């Protein structure tokens, strides 16, 4: 028997309102991958929960394609692998499910190809493939990060921010919203004046988070001009969730990533009341308390006993 690679990969929420394509935070929902060598010629994919059944089980699987892409880049040949997957990250809901799969594929290629990539190099690869660091960076490192990917130099730089001392509430609609569809409603360009305003709001939000001034941070998050005004109509529950959250003194209610999940930052003393109120009023969605993941990917090698 051979050793097995176990990966526990967190979900992520991106943007936090005004941090479009640059700010992200890891969340305590996980993609679990159990990977081992097999004698068969083709990779085998097994899904351990029904929510994953729509995913391909052949060479069209995203994990397979990314792993082979990395192997080719470093001129290594991967063995045939059995990949068992279990996930409580809902697909196409704005919680970074594709970023988690991408990061998992990088770790698989790194281990079974014996490439010896550092976390920094894993981040560079992930961002080059994804195009922006807002999901992949917190998925790899955990916590709350801001980052920038330079497409000319293909370099990504990230900065860690103290994890906010707040409670997070996720309100997850029953329907999917593909990132591509959500991006198609965004304008191609902004005026210089509009860009300066949005940049100032984003800068102020970051400084407020650093100072643990969550009231000010939330005020800035709610003034996004990059994406939320154009996407809110795609999420019919957004206005109702935001109105209820305001009744319980929430700091901010924003779209998680491309949506449709709605993220609320709440004072800890009000979060329980708020999530129960949301469950009672917004019955079409699932609302729950979530925890910020601070450690990122957990990698374990398990040997047969």
Swiss-Prot record:
Localization in the cell: Cytoplasm
Cellular component annotations (GO), alphabetically ordered: cytoplasm
Reaction catalysed by this enzyme: L-homoserine + ATP = O-phospho-L-homoserine + ADP + H(+)
Record GO biological process: threonine biosynthetic process
SUPFAM superfamilies: GHMP Kinase, C-terminal domain, Ribosomal protein S5 domain 2-like
Class in the EC hierarchy, top level: transferase
EC numbers on record: 2.7.1.39
InterPro entries found in the cross-reference section: GHMP_kinase_C_dom (IPR013750), GHMP_kinase_C_sf (IPR036554), GHMP_kinase_N_dom (IPR006204), GHMP_knse_ATP-bd_CS (IPR006203), Homoserine_kinase (IPR000870), Ribosomal_Su5_D2-typ_SF (IPR020568), Ribsml_uS5_D2-typ_fold_subgr (IPR014721)
Any one Pfam family match given in the protein's UniProt record, by short name: GHMP_kinases_N
Record carries keyword Acetylation: no
Pathway(s) per entry: Amino-acid biosynthesis; L-threonine biosynthesis; L-threonine from L-aspartate: step 4/5
Main location (coarse class): cytoplasm
Alphabetized GO MF terms: ATP binding; homoserine kinase activity
Keywords, comma-separated and alphabetical: Amino-acid biosynthesis, ATP-binding, Cytoplasm, Kinase, Nucleotide-binding, Threonine biosynthesis, Transferase
Residues binding ATP: 90-100
PANTHER family attached to this UniProt entry: HOMOSERINE KINASE, HOMOSERINE/4-DIPHOSPHOCYTIDYL-2-C-METHYL-D-ERYTHRITOL KINASE
Its biological purpose: Catalyzes the ATP-dependent phosphorylation of L-homoserine to L-homoserine phosphate.
NCBIfam families assigned: thrB (TIGR00191)
Family: Belongs to the GHMP kinase family. Homoserine kinase subfamily.
UniProt name for this protein: Homoserine kinase
Organism encoding this protein: Staphylococcus haemolyticus (strain JCSC1435)
